[in-house]
Amino acid sequence: MAAIRPRDLLSDGLLERLGGTSLAARAAAGGDTPAILSRDIAKLGEVGYLNVALPPEFGGLGCTLRQAACGQRRLARSAPLTASVVSAHLYWTGAAADAYRTGDNSVRWILLEAARGALFAGGHATAGGDLHFADPHSRCEPAGESGYRFRDPAVLASMTPAWDWVAVHAVHWVPSPGAARPDAVLAFAGRGSRCTPAFRIARVQPAGSPADAFTTSAIAWGHAILASVQYSDARRAFNAAVAAIDPVPAAPAGGHPLDQWPVAEAGLRLDAMKAKIAEITHPWPLVPEQDPDLGGQRLIGIFTMRHEVAEGAARVLDLTSQIASAPAIAAR
């Protein structure tokens, strides 16, 4: 566990200078979103926040997934858009660090690139595909010496203003009598390229549930970090709604449940979301020999956490509308 936590790098003064607040606020101010986010990313890089997951020998803090998720929650409370766009960089470097600690040097280059300042984006989402790693809709074909060309680009989901490498994920059908399912190819492409050379291919394995340390860690880091951003966004909306209401003395003849219940339910859901994230992030990093079921129950727990946080955040945002519409809340 890192002695200096990621959240320790995010001083109050730094958070106040970040511009990645809400889209509505930026639109009202006439701001240039890509330029603002690029400046935010540069500020986070200056304090070392983008390298928190790198092992110390690569110039990072060597933080755990739980520490990284905690840092993202703090960042998202002040600048949710900025937290969202740096999420992919954190989960790719975090997964690469997990693999490196197990003796797997196949993605060590990610750590080296990040140490020199390169930024990684997530682009494995595909239009109409919601399983991403397990069932990509993009297709690829061999190109050059052991490389691949990606025929239809994926959706660039993060780091849009500033990335150097983007993760691309696609399937490749191998024409053979015994091929029951295609290979899934996870690789990284540079700007303006649809091809990846062999040394930038992270994994080629049968399509389906990932079962190795790197891909499973990438899923764990990705879902936990993005869920942390969702949680903080919901918490921020809840806090703002409660702060805006007008507390009044309670009437002698009973309570006001229609006003008070949404506050109570939202608070309970937020507590449950935070606890679920903590439950999933606590055991990472994992060593495959200690947890042979990387692609089974462990994945189910990760997806359950993400679903519960997404549903909980949506419900909290609905409840904040009810809270904000209440004329007053009886003080107890």
What are these regions (language model features)?
Residues 232, 264-271, 303, 307-314:
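Generic structural signal for well-ordered, non-transmembrane alpha-helical segments
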Residues 8, 12-15, 19-33:
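N- or domain-start disorder-to-order transition segments that initiate the globular core
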Residues 124-126, 142, 154, 169-172, ...:
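Short, structured patches in soluble enzyme cores that scaffold and shape functional sites
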Residues 24-32, 272-308, 318-324, 328-329:
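C-terminal helix-coil-helix/basic helical segment that borders enzyme active sites and/or dimer interfaces
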Residues 196-270:
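Glycine-rich beta->alpha junctions and the first turn(s) of the following alpha-helix
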Residues 38, 42-45, 51-158:
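Glycine-rich flavin
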Residues 153-193:
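A short core secondary-structure module
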Residues 2-7:
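Intrinsic disorder at enzyme termini
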